Curated annotation (Swiss-Prot):
InterPro entries for the chain: AB_hydrolase_1 (IPR000073), AB_hydrolase_fold (IPR029058), BioH (IPR010076), Carboxylesterase_BioH (IPR050228)
Protein name, as recorded: Pimeloyl-[acyl-carrier protein] methyl ester esterase
Pathway(s) where this gene product acts: Cofactor biosynthesis; biotin biosynthesis
Species per Swiss-Prot/TrEMBL record: Klebsiella pneumoniae (strain 342)
Keywords: Biotin biosynthesis, Cytoplasm, Hydrolase, Serine esterase
Length: 257
């Protein structure tokens, strides 16, 4: 099986693995790697099937987490954005002894709306899957525009994300479809109750994909975790507010000693 693309930079004594979201790749972290590299040893990863980690089709969440773990350092802080948040959470559930802390960014344990749970309407996710088969580049671009809508720098932020996608090979339609299937079906709400490691959750108030209404619901469900809401950010707070985004990560590093 192909190795996944993995780059290690920085000289901090704390290892930080960064997992990107659906349709993207590790280039999305370019706006924060300079700030973080002097504090952490950063592990930048293209998830299987994305960016430079070609040769993978659709995978289950468990298989994706296992594949990433195989190349990971023995111990690290794991940070996952959006779909990457589910992968990082799955890693923490499978091997908590290898995770010093879990950080999820604009991520939900259950992306699909159901009953009284706020999220993306299942028919919207199914629509994206349908559109992928028709014109997947345009579908990915629409998804990127949705991620930055509402922020003062929306156009510029969408450009940064689009640049990250277009600078590398496009993911295969199978990998993209597999990622949407994970977003549509996975529900880790109960599985993450009582997670035995520090857990930090970061959100954007203007996020159109992960509604801020889930924040108090998860505060109640996971009382040991900590949540931070960036007031003027949407789905990609590290792109729109890089300096503010890095602050809680540096505080977490201090807390871990």
């Amino acid at each position: 099986m192909n190795d996944i693309w993995w780059q290690t930079i920085g000289e901090g004594d704390c290892h930080l693995v960064l997992l990107h979201g659906w349709g993207l790749n590790a280039q999305v972290w370019d706006c924060i790697t300079p700030q973080l590299a002097s504090h952490f040893t950063l592990h930048l990863v293209d998830l299987p099937g994305y960016g430079r980690s070609g040769g993978y089709g659709a995978m289950s969440l468990e298989a994706m987490a296992q594949r990433v773990l195989e190349q990971a350092p023995p111990q690290a802080v794991w940070l996952g954005w959006s779909l990457g948040g589910l992968v990082a959470s799955q890693v923490a559930m499978m091997h908590p002894e290898r995770v010093q802390a879990l950080v999820t960014v604009a991520s939900s344990p259950c992306f699909a709306a159901c009953d009284d749970w706020p999220g993306i309407k299942p028919e919207v996710l199914a629509g994206f899957q349908q559109q992928l088969s028709d014109d997947f580049q345009r579908t990915v671009e629409r998804f990127l525009a949705l991620q930055t809508m509402g922020t003062e720098s929306a156009r510029q932020d969408a450009r940064a994300l689009k640049q990250a996608v277009l600078s590398l090979p496009m993911p295969s339609a199978e990998a993209l479809n597999g990622g949407l299937e994970i977003l549509r079906t996975v529900d880790l709400r109960q599985a993450l109750v009582g997670l035995p490691i520090p857990f930090l959750r970061l959100y954007g108030r203007l996020d159109g994909l992960v509604p801020r209404k889930i924040v108090p619901l998860l505060d109640e469900l996971w009382p040991e975790s900590e949540s931070i809401l960036f007031d003027k950010a949407a789905h990609a707070p590290f792109v729109s507010h890089p300096a503010a985004f890095c602050e809680p990560l540096l505080a977490l590093k201090t807390q871990l000693g």
